Amino acid sequence: MIKKRYLVISDLQIPYHHEQAVKNLIKLVKREKFDLVLNTGDELDMQSQSRWAQGTKLEWEGTLDADRNLAQNILYDLGTTDVTRSNHTDRLYNTLLRAPSLIGLPELEYSKFMDFAGLGIRFHKKPFEFHRGWVLVHGDEGSMNSNA
């Protein structure tokens, strides 16, 4: 039987990530050569798109492009192969609900917004079985807490 090696990373919350921890993860990835590097979502915080930012100066922060670029660079450096949807990735769509005429623009679909195809990353909108009996899913899936 062939053994596979997986690294599962959760909730980077870029740009609020712990920089040294991410640097250490990148070193680990380069050293250990995992078969898959899986991310459980919340890779990009998107705080200015959160419902908590509405009506505050945070909503006008204007750092989304820089935050996205940083997230793309980190995901690339980590060798990320798969990302699953999460409550933070849903923030882009939830923001579009306030401007419904923009819904359907391909570049505003989260996976295209993040250019996952260009980064070689597969995006999963539903739980993803990466190994028989093992599923990649964000913690808010099936949560009984409506704030998750």
Go through the PLM ranges and name each one.
Residues 93-148:
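Acidic, His/Gly-enriched loop-helix segments that form or flank divalent-metal centers
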Residues 4-14, 133-141:
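Active-site-proximal beta-strand elements of phosphoester/diester hydrolases
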Residues 2, 9, 14-117:
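Core catalytic region of metal-dependent phosphoesterases/phosphodiesterases
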Residues 7, 82, 121-125:
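General small-molecule cofactor/ligand-binding pocket signal
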